[in-house]
Amino acid sequence: MDVIFAKIILKEDGRMITRRDLINDGFDCEIFVNETRFYNNMILKKDNHIIYIFKNKYNNLNSMFKECKLLTSINLSNFNTENVIDTSFMFNDCHSLNSIDLTNFRTNNVTNMSWMFGFCNSLNSINLSKFITDKVNDMNGMFSSCSKITSIDLTNFNTSNVTDMSYMLNSCSSLTSINLSNFNTNNVTHMNNMFSNCSSLKAIDLSNFNCDKIKTGDEMKEMFSGCYKLKIENIKHKDFKIRSQLTLDLKL
């Protein structure tokens, strides 16, 4: 089912609003059951808007809004995510999503953020300054094909436990700047296609990148492929494996 608008409604005491409560308020209610998203959650229709009623606590948000292709904005300011461990594919393929408020989104226990925002190709900007990523081990495809975002600030990201960064920023074709100066890649085993097709990226600082855990060329394959504006003099790096991959991808 396509979504026009979404927000969270909880009772003041934290309990779920009941079906009877909503019928009394004039909502047309129905239950939408799906094994992977919105499981046993209620969908309400009123004034051409669709409102989702969520449980008070979750531990798995995998694919929750996946392929909600008409969703344009979402406010998750009241969402209790303190127990969540998986946000993979959460907003994947939300092609019309251009605004999202994650300022109160707690990620303290999240271990998997793979493809979380993948193919959100209408998203102009995203504020992740409150994200805590200390336990995250998978960022594969996290921002892949966010083709309208011009800048992402990830300075607060703790990536010391991340093992997979493949396709992380792949096809962010409008991205001109990104701050990765605090990235810790000591445990990363996969960086293939990490920046591939970032065709507007002109400079990048990879001074802190450590590729010791990367064993084969396939694990860095096409890391910078399609970065047509990226010049070697604007790339800071110390790891010889990065230099080798730059030589291959940029045909230096």
Language-model-detected regions and their locations in the chain:
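Canonical position 11/12 of the leucine-rich repeat
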Residues: 57, 69-72, 83, 95-99, ...
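N-terminal capping/linker segments that flank leucine-rich repeat
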Residues: 1-82, 206-215, 221, 225-252
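Periodic small-residue-enriched repeat registers in elongated scaffold domains
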Residues: 64-65, 90-94, 116-120, 142-146, ...
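Residues marking helix boundaries in flexible regions
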Residues: 24, 75, 86, 101, ...
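Short, solvent-exposed linear patches
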Residues: 51-63, 78-89, 104-115, 130-141, ...
